[in-house]
Amino acid sequence: MDATRTATDALAALEARVRFELDCVDHPSAAWRPAVDAVLDVLIVGAGQSGLAVAFQLLRDKVTNIRVVDRAPAGREGPWRSFARMPTLRSPKAMNGPDLGVPSLPYRAWHEARFGAADWQCLDMIPKDLWADYLDWFRRVLALPVANGVEVTRLADAGGCVAATLRATDGAERVVHARRVVLATGLDGLGRWTMPAPVAAL
């Protein structure tokens, strides 16, 4: 094999890698202010894909004074292993998820690591059970600060921050304070299954 062909092959491989990574990182990022005291900067309600993505972005921006809570047990957050009836996601498989542009974190990278690149190419739509497995891996590999079995029962103004009442599965309640609260309770979170009174009044 001559040097020209070797260089051409290496360049083609590099260009393929560049295309792959650009495809994986096509996602915006946002800045957030740093933590300044013991009050949580952000309380995230819901540890499904949206809640995990918000937590990851905050941690990337060095906002570590956050907490994510979900009333479901670990692995049962979101609809994927509970009430989702469709066998696959409805989004195109190449659409970015909670990875925030990190090339090794998209579903595609995880899928290819588990099943191979050929399997990814043959895949039409992502099966919901595999998506749930991916989200479990995403949460674990990033060590996101999620507390399961914790429900938010009340949000109240506390003079410059929000007082959130948290109830554990054993019924024990406590109040935490946060500057911001993100309701990441799913697509229907503001649709009607459960709606906090302050949101219903909007």
List each language-model region with its residue ranges.
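Short hydrophobic core segments
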Residues: 43-45, 152, 164, 174-190
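Extreme N-terminal leader/targeting segments of oxidoreductases
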Residues: 1-41, 60-63, 172-174, 188-202
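Helical element adjacent to the flavin cofactor pocket in flavoenzyme catalytic cores
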Residues: 128-146, 152, 172, 184-189
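Conserved Rossmann-like nucleotide-cofactor binding loop
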Residues: 50, 74, 188
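Glycine-rich active-site loop/strand segments that organize a redox cofactor
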Residues: 71-129
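N-terminal Rossmann-like FAD-binding beta1-loop-alpha1 element of flavoenzymes
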Residues: 37-67
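PAS-family sensory domains
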Residues: 168-169
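A conserved short coil-to-beta-strand element within the FAD-binding core of flavoproteins
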Residues: 148-162
